[in-house]
Amino acid sequence: MEHHKHDTFLGGIVKALGLVFGDIGTSPIYTLTVIFTLTQPTIDNVYGILSLIFWTMTILVSAEYAWLAMSLGRKGQGGEIVLREIIMKLVKAGRLVAFAGFLSFVGVSLLLGDAVITPAISILSAVEGLLLIPGLEGLSTGALVAIAAAIAIGLFSVQHKGTDRVASAFGPIMALWFGTLAVTGAVSAFSMPQIVEAINPLHGIAFFRDNGLAGYFVLSEVILCATGGEALYADMGHLGKRPIVRAWHFVFVALYLNYLGQGVFAIAHPDAKNLLFGMVRSQAPALYIPFLILTIMATIIASQAIISGVFSIVYQGITTRLLPLMRVDYTSRQIKSQIYLGAVNWSLMVAVIFIMLVFRKSENLAAAYGMAVTGSMTITGIMMIIVFSHTTKKWRALVALVVTLIAAAYHVSTFSKLPHGAYWSIILASIPFVTIIIWTRGQRTLYRALKPLDLETFLISYEQIYAKGPIRGTGLFFTRETDVVPPYVVHCIIRSNIIYERNVFISLMISDEPLGVETELIRGIGPGLDAFRIEAGYMEMVDIERLLKENGIQEKVIFYGVEDISTRNPFWRFFSVLKKLTPNFVQFHKLPASRLQGVVTRVEM
C-alpha cells in the first residue's frame, strides 16, 4: 500500500475526498430526513438534533478516528486488524491477547456486514431523488429498486477491470459534491443565521430533557451522520495521515453547513419528503437534475470506496490467516494495493441487491442501519484503551475510555431498531464471523492433528536415503516452519524415496508489521538440503516465484501438502468444505501449474 509522497497539499486533500469520504459524505441525503419522520421538526427539536449531529461528528469521528486512532498507525497502515497486531506485540500473551483477537474478529465481521447495507442505502436514497422531477412523481417503488439494482450490478460488473483509469476523477467529483453541499446548506442557513447557535451542546441536553427515553433512542438515527467515519483510519494506508485529516476539516464544515441548511428547511417545510432534495429544488429548480446526477455519482464513488475497502480487509484477513485463501487478481501494474477478489465481489453484489429487495426504501434501510457502525466504533475504542494503557501516553487511555462509553451509548440505542430490521446487521456480520472462528480454530486443530516431525529425527532417515543417489534437479517442499517437517514431506522423501540433488524447504512466515519482505537462504541443513525462509508483512503481496529466482533457486518440481480430512464433527466438516472450495497455498501464490505436485495426507479431526 503506497504512500503518495509526491502529492501536493491540495492534491492530497482532493484524493482523500474521493477515496475516504464517500460514505460519510453521502449521509446528508438521508440522515435528517429519517430523523424528522420520527421526530416533529419543531424549532426546539431541530436545534437539539443539529447540536447532537455536531457533537456526534466531533466526538465519534474527529476525536475517535482523526485524532486517537490515526495516532496508532503501523508504517502508515490503519484498521482493526492493524490494532490487533499492535496489541499482540505490546501484550505478548495471555487472556488480553485472546480478548483483543476476539474483538478484532467481531469488528472485522461488523465492517464486512456493514459493507452490504451502505451501498444499498446510498444508491437507493439517491435514486429516490427522481421522484421530485416533474413527470416522474408516479415512479413505483419497484421501479426505483430496479434502477438502484441496475446501478449496483453495473458497478460490481466493472470491478475486475480496476479503478485505475477513473479513480483520478473521483476526487474532483467528490470535491464538487462537498462544495455543493456547503453552498446549498449555507444559502438555506443564511435565511435564519441564528441556526448556528445549534452548536451549543445545551440544545442537545435540552432535547434529551424534553423527550426523555424517546430522545435517547433518536441517537440511533443521529449516528447516521457519522457512518463512514471509520474509513479515516481504515484507509490511512492509501494516502497517509496528513491528507486525510486535512480533508476532514473541509468535509466537516461542508457537511455541517448542509445539515444546518436542511434544519432551516425542515422548520419551514415540515412535510418535505426528502430534506436535501427538497432544499436544493427550492433554491434552484433548473439545477435540480444536474444535482441529482451529481448525487448518484457521489453514491457510486462512495460504494466504490467501500468495495475497495472490503477487498483490502479480506486480503488482510487472508494474509493473517483469519480467512480462507481466495483468488486475488491485481488490477494495476503501478499500484500493488489495487486488488480484485472475484468471490468477494459477486457475493457482495448479490447481498446488496438482496438487501435492496428486502427493504425497498432508503427510510426502511435507515431504520435498520447503525448497529454495525456503532458496534465497530465501540470495539475500536476498547482496543485503543488496551493499546494506550500499555504505552507511555496513558492519559490517552482515559480519553479513549470516555469516547468508547459514548460510542457504546449510541450502540445500545440502536437495539431499538431490532424490530425494524437491524437484525440484518447481525445476520450479515455473522457470516464472516462464523467463517473466521471455524477457519482459525480449524487450522490450529488440523496442525495439531498432522503431528509434524522434528527436523533432527527427519534428518537421520533423510541422510540414509540421500546417500543411495538422488534425482537430478531441484525439488521444492512447502513447510509451515523450517524446524519441523510436515507428514507429506516425510511420505514423499522417506517413504517414497523421492529425493533430489537439491531439496529446498520453503516457509512463508507472516510478520507483525504490515509491510516489508525479508528472505533468508540457509544452506546445508543436511546433504543437498537447504531452507528458504520468507518473512512478509501482512499487507504485502508476496511474489514467491520472483523471490526464488532472486536467490538462485531453479525448481524442477514443487511439492505441497493436500489434507484429506476425515471427521464427524459438523464444524470440522464445514472447515473441510471451505478448504476444498478455496484455492490452496500454491494456487493462491500463482506458482507454475506444470511444476506442481500435490501429496495427499489423510487426517482425522
Swiss-Prot record:
<dbReference type="GO" id="GO:0015293">
    <property type="term" value="F:symporter activity"/>
</dbReference>
<dbReference type="InterPro" id="IPR003855">
    <property type="entry name" value="K+_transporter"/>
</dbReference>
<feature type="transmembrane region" description="Helical">
    <location>
        <begin position="138"/>
        <end position="158"/>
    </location>
</feature>
<feature type="transmembrane region" description="Helical">
    <location>
        <begin position="339"/>
        <end position="359"/>
    </location>
</feature>
<feature type="transmembrane region" description="Helical">
    <location>
        <begin position="16"/>
        <end position="36"/>
    </location>
</feature>
<keyword id="KW-0997">Cell inner membrane</keyword>
<feature type="transmembrane region" description="Helical">
    <location>
        <begin position="287"/>
        <end position="307"/>
    </location>
</feature>
<dbReference type="InterPro" id="IPR053952">
    <property type="entry name" value="K_trans_C"/>
</dbReference>
<feature type="transmembrane region" description="Helical">
    <location>
        <begin position="212"/>
        <end position="232"/>
    </location>
</feature>
<dbReference type="GO" id="GO:0005886">
    <property type="term" value="C:plasma membrane"/>
</dbReference>
<keyword id="KW-0813">Transport</keyword>
<dbReference type="GO" id="GO:0016020">
    <property type="term" value="C:membrane"/>
</dbReference>
<keyword id="KW-0630">Potassium</keyword>
<dbReference type="InterPro" id="IPR053951">
    <property type="entry name" value="K_trans_N"/>
</dbReference>
<protein>
    <recommendedName>
        <fullName>Probable potassium transport system protein Kup 3</fullName>
    </recommendedName>
</protein>
<comment type="function">
    <text>Transport of potassium into the cell. Likely operates as a K(+):H(+) symporter.</text>
</comment>
<dbReference type="Pfam" id="PF22776">
    <property type="entry name" value="K_trans_C"/>
</dbReference>
<keyword id="KW-0406">Ion transport</keyword>
<feature type="transmembrane region" description="Helical">
    <location>
        <begin position="49"/>
        <end position="69"/>
    </location>
</feature>
<keyword id="KW-1003">Cell membrane</keyword>
<feature type="transmembrane region" description="Helical">
    <location>
        <begin position="247"/>
        <end position="267"/>
    </location>
</feature>
<dbReference type="InterPro" id="IPR023051">
    <property type="entry name" value="Kup"/>
</dbReference>
<dbReference type="GO" id="GO:0015079">
    <property type="term" value="F:potassium ion transmembrane transporter activity"/>
</dbReference>
<dbReference type="Pfam" id="PF02705">
    <property type="entry name" value="K_trans"/>
</dbReference>
<keyword id="KW-0812">Transmembrane</keyword>
<feature type="transmembrane region" description="Helical">
    <location>
        <begin position="97"/>
        <end position="117"/>
    </location>
</feature>
<comment type="similarity">
    <text>Belongs to the HAK/KUP transporter (TC 2.A.72) family.</text>
</comment>
<feature type="transmembrane region" description="Helical">
    <location>
        <begin position="368"/>
        <end position="388"/>
    </location>
</feature>
<dbReference type="GO" id="GO:0006813">
    <property type="term" value="P:potassium ion transport"/>
</dbReference>
<feature type="transmembrane region" description="Helical">
    <location>
        <begin position="397"/>
        <end position="417"/>
    </location>
</feature>
<feature type="transmembrane region" description="Helical">
    <location>
        <begin position="418"/>
        <end position="438"/>
    </location>
</feature>
<keyword id="KW-0769">Symport</keyword>
<keyword id="KW-1133">Transmembrane helix</keyword>
<keyword id="KW-0472">Membrane</keyword>
<feature type="transmembrane region" description="Helical">
    <location>
        <begin position="170"/>
        <end position="190"/>
    </location>
</feature>
<keyword id="KW-0633">Potassium transport</keyword>
